[in-house]
């Protein structure tokens, strides 16, 4: 069984432990076997990954990076589908749209209604975050990656939380999918086939894809 199904089994166990403790040892054993089997088959039916897609119909967004907003050490590819932190400030104009203190970049298109999603490929590097931000997000000065700053994000920090050692660097590449339910006020992240939902109050403001790249990180939109 793949690690994702094993993790899913653990999560189901934690969610049902309040019921399981009331059962006899024999009944508990049967429940454990049933949960394990269900997770295994869910894993196999989705090509070795536990199912974790949010319900509903979502419109795929073809996201590109906006080089006019990119921090000086972030280099956007010619096709605007990849961005890399080269670690050295480049000579770029300090226009009002550009982040000047935090290694961030925004993307397009923006969203004002409906249900949308976009996918981003990440590598083995550390310190990155992907999400959305209000179009009015602060560009100058230090930036906190929190909803109070109009930013809803998920990234390597969450992956570290899943590890036994909180300081251990995640060593595999993968994909993160961001679902934006504008009217419902939800931002849903599918990372490692586990969904995490953040409640959001957009206040009618347009929101755009948001990316943070610390260290020598590169991200590619799919």
UniProtKB/Swiss-Prot annotation:
Residues 53-159 form the B30.2/SPRY domain. Expressed by the venom gland. It comes from the Eukaryota. Disulfide bonds: none annotated. It is found in: Secreted. SMART domains: PRY (SM00589), SPRY (SM00449). Neurotoxin that produces dose-dependent hypolocomotion and hyperalgesia in mice. May directly act on the central nervous system, as it is 6500-fold more potent when administered intracerebroventricularly than intraperitoneal. This is Vespryn.
């Amino acid at each position: 069984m793949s690690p994702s199904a094993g993790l899913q089994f653990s999560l189901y166990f934690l969610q049902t432990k309040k019921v399981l403790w009331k059962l006899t040892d024999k009944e508990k054993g049967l429940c454990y076997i049933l949960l394990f089997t269900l997770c295994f088959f869910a894993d196999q039916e989705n090509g070795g990954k536990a199912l974790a897609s949010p319900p509903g119909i979502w419109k795929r967004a073809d996201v590109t990076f906006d080089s006019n907003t990119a921090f000086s050490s972030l280099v956007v590819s010619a096709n605007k589908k990849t961005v890399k932190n080269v670690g050295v400030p480049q000579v770029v104009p300090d226009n009002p749209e550009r982040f000047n203190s935090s290694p961030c970049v925004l993307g397009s298109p923006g969203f004002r209604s409906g249900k949308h999603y976009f996918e981003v490929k990440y590598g083995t590097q550390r310190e990155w975050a992907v999400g959305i931000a209000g179009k009015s997000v602060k560009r100058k000065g230090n930036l906190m990656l929190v909803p109070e700053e109009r930013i809803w994000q998920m990234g390597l920090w969450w992956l570290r939380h899943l590890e036994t050692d909180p300081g251990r660097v995640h060593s595999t590449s993968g994909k993160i999918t961001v679902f934006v339910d504008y009217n419902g006020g939800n931002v849903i992240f599918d990372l490692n086939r586990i969904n995490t939902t953040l409640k959001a109050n957009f206040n009618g403001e347009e929101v755009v894809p948001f990316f943070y790249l610390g260290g020598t990180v590169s991200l590619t939109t799919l």
